[in-house]
Amino acid sequence: MGKANKKAKAPSATIAQNRKARHEYHLEEHFEAGLVLEGWEVKSLRAGKGNLTEAYVLLKNGEAFLFGARFEPLNTASTHVNPDPTRTRKLLLHRRELGRVFGGVQKDGFTCVPVSLYWKKGFAKCDIALAKGKQKFDKRATEKERDWNRQKQRVLRQR
């Protein structure tokens, strides 16, 4: 009886998140970018071995590239391929999106940061955002607000 009512839990579509980016920047405008990956990288992402902590987006010659993202190779990866965990990966964006990103970075002083990696219809996607850096007092204010909201939720749950 108990087994029939339980549903199998679907795997999460999110592979990795860049929490550091959410803490250090005001995220303004988000874009969904595809990634040019090798076979071993897709396998390691399926195993959840992606890391965006030190990653950033570099705009060069009308193209966007993901630098510093670590995709740890699996032990069972191919022997004839030499995997490089921190290689530069090209981001795939539409021409208009690239124009908006370039304009935001060059004219408006935004920074382009990767926010998360996720699966969409079997393809690995990277959520990138145009962001402004937070000052120290902004970070403190965000932390205080988060703590205050947690305290409010605790009080409401106890009633």
From Swiss-Prot:
Main location: cytoplasm
Domain of life of the organism encoding this protein: Bacteria
GO MF assignments: RNA binding
GO CC, alphabetical: cytosol
Pfam annotation, one family: SmpB
Listed InterPro entries: SmpB, SsrA-bd_prot, SsrA-bd_prot_CS
PROSITE patterns registered for this protein in UniProt: SSRP
Keywords, comma-separated and alphabetical: Cytoplasm, RNA-binding
Biased composition (Basic and acidic residues): 140-150
Segments of this protein annotated with the region Disordered: 140-159
SUPFAM superfamilies named in the record: Small protein B (SmpB)
Gene3D superfamilies with a match to the protein in the record: 2.40.280.10
Compartments reported by the entry: Cytoplasm
A GO BP entry: trans-translation
Protein's job: Required for rescue of stalled ribosomes mediated by trans-translation. Binds to transfer-messenger RNA (tmRNA), required for stable association of tmRNA with ribosomes. tmRNA and SmpB together mimic tRNA shape, replacing the anticodon stem-loop with SmpB. tmRNA is encoded by the ssrA gene; the 2 termini fold to resemble tRNA(Ala) and it encodes a 'tag peptide', a short internal open reading frame. During trans-translation Ala-aminoacylated tmRNA acts like a tRNA, entering the A-site of stalled ribosomes, displacing the stalled mRNA.
Family: Belongs to the SmpB family.
Protein name stated in the entry: SsrA-binding protein
Lineage: Bacteria, Pseudomonadati, Pseudomonadota, Gammaproteobacteria, Oceanospirillales
